[in-house]
Amino acid sequence: MENMQIRTMKVTDYEKVYALWMSCKNMGFNDIDDSKEGISRFLERNPNTSFVAMENDELQGIILGGHDGRRGYIYHMSVAEKHRKKGIGSSLVEKCLASFKNEKISKVALLVFKYNEAGNSFWEKQGFILREDVNYRNIELCELVRIDT
């Protein structure tokens, strides 16, 4: 982590980011929102809240965060398996949360699959509280192909 730098994500990072996402277990994606075009739209709307951890030209981790002006959301967070347990994930979360604070966002939410034990443990250590008083619901407005890793 000596030469690791965290910087805002750019659409030119997409190929490396997508490859990292596909290498991580227990994550959910889809063919529209997580396509290069979908991520490009997302980054245009949220240019300052997603980050990559790089060392030289190697992608070590990524956090995809955005907000609607009221609430922040962390959509994906991944660290390459060989770089885990080095504080990279925590550093990415810290940077993302600071960017939300800078944009006057007061609350941040995220979703983690129930069976993703490592992910749930990580987010609990980051201070994210499990809400058991709400049901999460969604509706697809177009046909999406799920890509679960």
Regions found by a protein language model. Give the residues of each.
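A short beta-loop-alpha structural element at the N-terminal edge
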Residues: 4-17
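Conserved acetyl-CoA-binding loop-helix of GNAT-fold acetyltransferases
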Residues: 85-98, 125
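Conserved beta-strand-loop-alpha-helix junction that forms the acyl-donor binding cleft
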Residues: 110-119, 138
